[in-house]
């Protein structure tokens, strides 16, 4: 059966390709027709540009990007018990492709009734800031600074508010993203390029600095800023991947003397199903995501700037990878990519 995919054959080149692929199922497998697929700009562009500390830097090209999708089951193996044909699901780490095969308990999760498939496609991506917020262990009334307002940062700000943080302060260089963050419930939105940025953050937190910080940019200058303004004995969680990570920081001044907790929150540290020692798995985070989404407390539809055809892959990645003001969120629409898949 044919399958369409997007991949990077070389640096700064994206290709949409259709080729024959084996769709034979093992007894415990399902075939998922992908409906929508959200581009994760930070991770995907790091590989697109062949930056350090990426999969491409280790395994080289070709690279197959994409990890957060929604779809529906069109074929099941003889031993599958959990799903039936027609069930809506989200899949993790499936790549940008028209269909995927999954074992019924392997990073696949049912979509509840009442959830739009476009919103559901963000489930796996949204679980990353959920991991960061869980690890921060925010207490009611603690201030939280979110540095960076891309997709992850905009979701992290909403989750910090849900967790009880006040005030929620966000920062981003883009005026449009700062305004969107305010619309989504942030209390303050600051420009990190302003010369008095650190002083403003401290002023907004009664002179103490925020007790909790989510660093989403992966930028070394942003990391330095948050270490300067975080409160004594505060917690800083590193959510954004620091691709160029060998620049020095004054550990004695900004971490040791201030008693700061520096917390890693890479998704690879979280189990898919069995709760971690601090009590949550990837599946738990999906469940929470859908609860918050259905209740209206978490919003992701306003993060989507454009719904695009996968056939336009090269133009899409040129737009987000080469533009000075790239779109925030691009959702790939696979519903018209048929590949002779049974319906």
Question: PLM features: residue spans?
Answer:
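Glycine-rich beta-strand-centered segment in the early N-terminal region that forms part
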Residues: 22-39, 51-95
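A structural motif shared across PLP-dependent enzymes of the aminotransferase-like
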Residues: 41, 93-105
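Mid-domain Rossmann-like dinucleotide-binding core that forms the NAD(H)/NADP(H) cofactor-binding site
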Residues: 116-195, 199
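Glycine-rich cofactor phosphate-binding loops and adjacent beta1-alpha1 units
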Residues: 184-263
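C-terminal capping/lid region of NAD(P)-dependent oxidoreductase domains
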Residues: 207, 237, 244, 248, ...
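C-terminal substrate-binding/catalytic core of Rossmann-like NAD(P)-dependent dehydrogenases/reductases
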Residues: 250-304, 315
């Amino acid at each position: 059966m044919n399958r369409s995919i997007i991949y990077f054959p070389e640096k700064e080149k994206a290709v949409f390709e259709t080729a024959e692929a084996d769709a034979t199922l093992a007894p415990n497998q399902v075939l998922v027709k992908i409906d929508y697929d959200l581009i994760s700009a930070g991770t995907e562009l790091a590989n697109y540009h062949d930056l350090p500390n990426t999969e491409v830097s280790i395994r080289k090209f070709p690279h197959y990007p994409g990890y957060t999708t929604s779809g529906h089951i069109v074929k099941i193996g003889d031993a599958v018990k959990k799903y039936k044909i027609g069930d809506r699901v989200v899949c993790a780490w499936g790549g940008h492709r028209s269909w995927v095969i999954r074992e019924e308990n392997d990073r696949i999760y049912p979509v509840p009734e009442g959830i739009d498939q476009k919103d559901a496609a963000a489930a796996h991506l949204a679980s990353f800031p959920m991991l960061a917020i869980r690890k921060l262990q925010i207490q009611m009334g603690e201030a939280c600074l979110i540095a960076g307002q891309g997709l992850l940062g905009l979701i992290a700000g909403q989750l910090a508010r849900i967790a009880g943080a006040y005030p929620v302060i966000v920062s981003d260089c883009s005026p449009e993203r700062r305004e969107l963050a305010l619309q989504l419930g942030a209390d303050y939105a600051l420009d990190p390029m302003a010369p008095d940025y650190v002083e403003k953050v401290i002023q907004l937190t009664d002179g103490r600095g925020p007790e909790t910080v989510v660093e989403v940019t992966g930028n070394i200058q942003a990391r330095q800023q948050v270490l300067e303004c975080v409160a004594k004995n505060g917690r800083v969680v590193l959510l954004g991947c620091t691709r160029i990570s060998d620049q020095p920081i004054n550990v004695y001044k900004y971490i040791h003397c201030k008693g700061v907790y520096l917390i890693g929150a890479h998704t690879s540290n979280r189990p898919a199903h069995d709760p971690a020692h601090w009590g949550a798995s990837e599946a738990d985070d999906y469940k929470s995501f859908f609860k918050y989404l259905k209740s209206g407390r978490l919003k992701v539809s306003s993060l989507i700037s454009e719904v695009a055809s996968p056939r336009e892959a090269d133009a899409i990645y040129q737009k987000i990878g080469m533009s000075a003001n790239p779109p925030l969120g691009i959702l790939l629409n696979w519903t018209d990519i048929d590949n002779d898949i049974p319906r």
